[in-house]
Each structure stands twice: as C-alpha cells, then as structure tokens.
C-alpha cells in the first residue's frame, strides 16, 4: 500500500448523523451506498448541508426505493445490511434534501442496475422495489 498525501483532502472517522467537522468547511461530500443504512436520513442531509460551503456539492450513489417495500423485505436484516431494505423513496429523499436547504436536486435512477440488484438476493424479488441511483444537490450560495 502506497501512501499518497494530498493537502486538500481530509479523511475523518465519524457518524454520518453527526459529522466531526466545522460548519461550511467542505467543497464536496461524496457518499457511496451508506445513507440507506442510516435510520436518521433527514439528519444526514441536515449535517451535509451544515458542513458544505455555500455552493458546495453533495454527490451520492445509493439505493432508492421505486415502490413500497413489503414488511417482510424491510425487516430482512441481510437485505438491510446489503443496502437494500433501508432504501427511501425518491420522493422522500427529494423532500429531505429540500427540507435541509439544498437546491438543484437531481435524482437519477439507474434502471440498468436492476439485474445487479437481482443478483444480490435472487429469491427475494427485491429488484421490483429498489434500484441504484445517483443523487446530486447543491448548497445555495448566500
């Protein structure tokens, strides 16, 4: 493993509902299949808004719900830890982002991910309820 130092990059360990950084410090927040695991998604987006500089960008790749998940699937711990059962609907994510203060919100479901999702849990039919998506939002400039 080769260690490379970047002056403009900072990695910190913390909880996504309570980020260990100052207000308005980050230019970009990147998240890959993590937010669906949080039971406090609205808080995650509020924290993201807090730490981004005005004009800062939120860039997320995550699983979103395209239909209401049956209770059996929602309560399946393997599907939850597999980043599927905790997925929120596109409408709910958009509302949480708006409530946090973001604008220029774009949520793009990737229908081509259904085959990949199907392979995660073939017998569950989870692909009928979730899909991978890119989620982008901007913290408005003051």
Task: Map each language-model feature to its residues.
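A short acidic, Gly/Pro-enriched loop at the edge of an enzyme's catalytic core
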Residues: 17-28
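A short glycine-rich, Lys/Arg-flanked "PGG" loop and its adjoining helix->strand segment in the class I
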Residues: 42-57
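Short, glycine-/aromatic-enriched active-site segment of Class I SAM-dependent methyltransferases
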Residues: 65-84
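Short, small-residue-biased leader/transition segments that mark boundaries at the very start
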Residues: 1-5, 137
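C-terminal lobe and adjacent flexible extensions of AdoMet/dcAdoMet transferase-like proteins
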Residues: 96-142
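A short SAM/SAH-binding and catalytic strip from SAM-dependent methyltransferases
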Residues: 27-40
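Conserved SAM-binding strand-loop segment of SAM-dependent methyltransferases
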Residues: 6-18
């Amino acid at each position: 493993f080769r260690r490379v130092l970047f002056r403009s990059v900072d990695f910190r360990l913390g909880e996504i509902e309570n980020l260990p950084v100052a207000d308005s410090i980050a230019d970009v927040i990147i998240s890959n299949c993590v937010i669906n695991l949080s039971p406090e998604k609205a808080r995650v987006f509020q924290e993201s808004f807090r730490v981004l500089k005005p004009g800062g960008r939120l860039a997320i790749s995550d699983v979103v719900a395209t239909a209401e998940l049956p209770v059996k699937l929602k309560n399946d711990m393997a599907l939850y830890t597999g980043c599927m059962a905790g997925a929120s609907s596109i409408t709910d994510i958009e509302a949480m982002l708006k409530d946090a203060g973001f604008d220029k919100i774009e949520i793009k479901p990737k229908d081509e991910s259904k085959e990949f999702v199907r392979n995660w849990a073939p017998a569950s039919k989870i692909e009928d309820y979730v899909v991978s998506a890119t989620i982008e939002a901007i913290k408005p400039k003051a």
